[in-house]
Amino acid sequence: MFQEAIARYLQSSGHSQIQLKSVLFDMDGVLFNSMPYHADAWHKVMERHDLHLSREEAYLHEGRTGAATINIVYQRQYGKDATPEMIKSIYAEKSAEFNSNPEPERMPGAWEVLQKIKEIGRAHV
């Protein structure tokens, strides 16, 4: 799958090869399996504010900003956006709840990929 995508890119761009200088990684869900902690934190904090967001639905908002997640739930229940003060307060609680968890486990294979990148002399960010 990746080989085909690379071949298409090389053909369409006119390049003969790809020479990576560095590799940029996202942490959550790529290097560390932190999404269960995010989902649990969102669920607990929303319930404290009488807002309904299941752990399962929290996964659907992965990658969305905290403010957007709060507003989606708030709009669904109340037909309007949450105030900036409410967003700040709810998101601060969610962050504190998330940070109370132990360090998440590495995603399978993440350490090996980082070691390979280091081995071939590429920077990782």
Locate predicted features:
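Active-site neighborhood of HAD-like aspartate-dependent phosphohydrolases
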Residues: 2-57
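Metal-dependent phosphoesterase signature
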Residues: 74-115
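Hydrophobic/aromatic residues within well-ordered alpha-helical segments
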Residues: 38, 62-66, 90-94
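Conserved acidic
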Residues: 34, 57-58, 86, 102
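Short, acidic loop-to-helix structural element flanking the phosphoryl-transfer center
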Residues: 9-14, 19, 99-124
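Short alpha-helical
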Residues: 37, 65-68, 105, 112
